[in-house]
């Protein structure tokens, strides 16, 4: 499972999402090694209760990369959840995370208002499907509390490899 950064229906030129050519290169390496590759995430930025993840896969270029390279997209908003008891309460994470043999986290190099720089850690927040992310943001309103939530998600998800896309960094 390639866990990309798919914040919303953004093109790669915005530097808001993992660059699709970066994802393509990693997908090719894995497909050459006979791996079944999934490209997955749940977008942020839900408006009026509608998550834009499906549209985000198209606009970002991930849908095209998956089709051209023999991978599958996994829209975490539509794949179901698994409830996990954690030190910060019960968390509901996307089911593909528990079905994948191996998780590669592909964050985007960018800053974030909740922590200045979050590196690979913040990207796994997208493992929380759909509108549930807003509730976690609300329940952890300051950087210290939000950081604790991110740490727990990273413990549970346990990505085996983190490779950051720094093709174009984003600030703000």
Give the predicted meaning of each segment:
Residues 1-172:
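N-terminal and secondary-structure boundary signal
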